[in-house]
Amino acid sequence: MTLSTAQEIIEDIHQGKMVILMDDEDRENEGDLIIASDKVTPEAINFMATYGRGLICLTLNKERCLQLELPMMVKSNTDKFATPFTISIEAASGVTTGISVNDRARTVQAAIAATATAKDIVMPGHIFPLMAQDGGVLARAGHTEAGCDVARLAGLEPSSVIVEILNDDGTMARRPQLEVFAKKHGLKLGTVADLIEYRNKYETMIERISECKLNTEFGEFDMITYRDKINHQIHYALQKGNIEPNSQTLVRVHLQDTFKDILQTGSTRWTLPAAMERISSENGVLVIVTKQEDPEMVISKIQNLALENKETPVVNSQSRQVGLGSQILSDLGIRKMRLLSSSSHLYHSLSGFGLEIVEYVCS
């Protein structure tokens, strides 16, 4: 089955049709039914419940979540994919038990109304909102962001209702089953990676603001400085040597971390100095993605150090930084990467940025 382009997916969303979007095989590799919230009907909810079978969720941007005063479901998200659930909701009026398809459609309508406030919903309920990251799929390659993006690009409220597609036996539907499902129900099937490529072509979260030579203890680098258009954060790329599009470029994307960078905590092989030294000797690119560290997270790290706490760390803080790093690498003309990494961690939907990891350099 030929996959539909992002433009074809967006056109169907604009027309009020349901579509299927798949994510990476190295991520959840699931397919979600998606329909713009503006176009939701009881019949659409019934189709999702009957044939999708997964959890019916409502994707919302951060601005809408603040408008509705929605608290996150948990303070520290330790889910593998950092799925950003808020507390579940129900319409404050016009519903009965809240679970019927009519009630759930009504709840969606109440939540996305232009004048909606916290008084228009109650918590908990039978609709599960998901808060998309600023920047959409360019920041996080998830169905949450994809749902908001396709609706916005279709000229609608940036919100969608989504549900995972399960097989008849309750297992997750993968691409072969999704193709059969799409043909059976006459739905277009696309990918999050293609949506990323589409947005990366016509939109970007970053802009170059300066270029200069930078002398360091590891030699001279070309430093290219970028600005994040959303939060105005500044990021840097240190380049050594020329970049050839068809060559395999040595790359390190370094995410700012106070404890690792200044206090040298943690066991990572590729500290900032180590990465600079390696790239200086072999040529390549070091991208330094900065971030505003949440004071509560810093305090939590300090408390964990004091208690010698060995619990699994929170995993939701890097997805936006990875998206920014990918855009910078793409802007520099990099296609194939030899990635300096402490592990062969899989980064999702890089193909949407025109990037491919050909080797993990762990030592």
UniProtKB/Swiss-Prot annotation:
Tell me the Gene Ontology biological-process terms attached to this UniProt entry: riboflavin biosynthetic process
One GO CC term on file: cytosol
User: Keywords on this record?
Assistant: Lyase, Magnesium, Manganese, Metal-binding, Riboflavin biosynthesis
Enzyme Commission designation: 4.1.99.12
Site label Essential for catalytic activity, positions: H126, E164
Q: What does this protein's UniProt record list under function?
A: Catalyzes the conversion of D-ribulose 5-phosphate to formate and 3,4-dihydroxy-2-butanone 4-phosphate.
Q: What is this protein called?
A: 3,4-dihydroxy-2-butanone 4-phosphate synthase
Q: Which organism is it from?
A: Photobacterium phosphoreum
